[in-house]
């Protein structure tokens, strides 16, 4: 609504050049559901939690990407508590799987591999269910083998986990104030 139109590659480049770990938001805070102005909502959150307000677009973008990755870590911890098996990697599917920077941030903060793709998971899943109903594939394992035979997901390995763990503690401190 602010009249700026960036391509996805431009958004990623902007996030890359911004200073890391300067400000954080809780992406699940209700104020971010559908605000009249996302930038104003982020500024208000930062003000209320004693953080520097972002000014430049790259600062907003970096804040959003890092905050999403940190929130993924929190949710993954909850899922790990409930899962009857150890979780050793995170699969990201759909449109988000194409955001390499966010996927790398996520791998860094969860300190495990992130497997990204397919980006068209819904359509592929629909095709597989129809193939199963038509008797063309026997079970979900055959569906997975078929999908894996023609798709190569990207794999992101953790980097710099120490600095990300320290930043996560800061994120937790900030988001616990709300």
Labelled PLM ranges:
Residues 1-89, 98-122, 128-178:
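Active-site core segments that coordinate phosphate-bearing ligands/cofactors
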Residues 95:
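Glycine- and other small-residue-rich loops at beta-strand/loop junctions that grip anionic moieties
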